[in-house]
Amino acid sequence: MPEVSPAREPISRTYRFVMAVLAPVIRWWGRLEVVGAEHLPTAGPTLLVGNHDSYWDPVAIGMAGRERRQIRALAKSTLWKFPGLAPILDAMGQVPIERGKGDAQALQAAIDTLRGGGCIGVFPEGTISRGKLLRARSGTGRLALEVPEAQLVSVTVTGTVDIVRFPKRPRIRVEFFAPADGPVGDGEEPKAVSVRLMAEIRERAPIALPGRRRTAERLRRAAEDADPRALN
């Protein structure tokens, strides 16, 4: 019998609405370019792994993949504290996570989503880089090991740091691709999975400084003081 493909996951109205509202910023002002969209499956469990240099990265990734599927990102829990934002994030299927605390509840929610055939988006560095070399955290590897049937897809985002640099228009580029070393190997440790995925992603998308000129310069000095290699 021929193999039956998984049913395409419906995209929620709220998700479509938010993407439509933000489209002018990303598609028009940001001149969005999408490469390798075919690597993002339209159905089935998918773990999407990317770099994080700007608050706009999740939006750009969602915009780049919106014709294919709904991406549920692990997002910092403090976003749920903004008035009116929590119900929108919930309706979009986003998953709140306590940063830096090994949030078992959030990871379990992500695992359940993957096992249910959804797409989870993660940033192994855990937060915006702000010009610094951040270590990849083990959570990404844990998700990959807990749901080995999930397809592993990498994504790079560039240009989002320039969105606020008016009147200069940014050129946002989102590229989806399959990791060069393939899926999780036998006996591979969670941290090792996260590290190798992030290393390849950063080769394609080096750390970029967010903010306007003064902010970017302040972040540059702080990054160089912390680690001179960060922006070299």
Model-predicted segments: where are they?
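Short, flexible loop segments at the rims of nucleotide/cofactor-binding pockets, characterized by
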Residues: 23-29, 50, 96-100, 130-132
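Catalytic core of membrane glycerolipid acyltransferases/transacylases, capturing the structured
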Residues: 41-101
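Short amphipathic alpha-helical segments and helix-helix/interface helices
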Residues: 22, 61-62, 86, 110, ...
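Short amphipathic alpha-helix with an adjacent loop that forms part of the alpha/beta core around
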Residues: 38-41, 111-112
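Residues at the C-termini of beta-strands that transition into short coil/loop
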Residues: 38, 77, 98, 156, ...
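A transmembrane-helix-recognition feature enriched in membrane-embedded lipid enzymes
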Residues: 2-39, 67, 83-92
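Non-catalytic C-terminal accessory region of glycerolipid acyltransferases
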Residues: 2-14, 104-232
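Conserved beta-strand scaffold positions in the cores of enzyme catalytic domains, especially
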Residues: 34, 73, 94-96, 152, ...
